Amino acid sequence: MKEALEAALREILGPGEVVALRRLPGGASKEAWAVDYRTGEALHPLFLRRAGGGVIYSKTLALAEEFRLLQVAWAHGVKVPEPLHYFPDLEGREAFLMRRLEGETIGARVVRRPELARARETLPQAMAEELAKIHALSPDEVPFLQPPSLPSWRAALEEAYRDLDALGEPHPALEWGLRWLLDHPPRELPPVVVHGDFRVGNLLVDGEGLVAVLDWEFAHLGDPREDLAWPLVRAWRFGEDGKRLGGVGEVGPFLERYNALTGRDIAEEELFWWE
């Protein structure tokens, strides 16, 4: 693997050598590797994402698609690690390289660590700004993201029903909840590029604020309220339940900033359906 990485990096960053290559823990379906590449006196910290041995969820993007989406997002100013190179076959599996950035991703730390207090103050505005940029991406640049055949809300609800049916056992409270959603459909909005897992825990944060939006494998075309509501889910508050937006802030300023940037008029009450 080292030789293949060096061959690609010489074309991208110039003559040099891989001086460190270590696999990182975690990654149920994708391998994660830290790569250090030296060119003369400069050391380039990189991150390698490589296909693993299986697929956790059938609707995740292929690595080639995820890499292309990162390229588009980077080109349009979304805060993502700079994508550098895609490998169709790196020792038998596809992979891609990107810049390695420093910061914290573990949600329980983001919502509590004293040294991240300043970041928590700025995150609601920063999250709104990044979502506005993501939702402005042109679907024409990512044609592998196909529009849903049904209204986005209906497609999401039918998927929830399928997942519940697959459990093979009764869950009447969940059935009642899904029925309520079916009887109270939201207004339809035009589909946009949706990140699909936008929340604290998938945001790289340092002492000053948001560094990068990570983990794009669930991206799709859908309702923008999916991304607005997902970081409100209680599980993503990491014990700071009094702060509905990801354990770091309130929904009002976040949504107000998003609406101002996008020209949309989404009300906070609309997010309950998606949450």
PLM regions: where:
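Conserved protein kinase catalytic-loop anchor
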Residues: 191-193, 211
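Catalytic-loop of the protein kinase fold
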Residues: 193-195, 200
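Active-site activation/catalytic loop segments of kinase-like enzymes and analogous catalytic loops
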Residues: 226-263
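Juxta-kinase regulatory segment immediately upstream of eukaryotic protein kinase catalytic domains
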Residues: 1-14
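All-alpha amphipathic helical-bundle segments outside canonical DNA-binding/catalytic cores
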Residues: 147-148, 265-275
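ATP-binding pocket architecture of kinase catalytic cores
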Residues: 22-155, 162-176, 185-190
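Activation of the activation-loop gatekeeper triad in protein kinase-fold domains
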Residues: 214-219
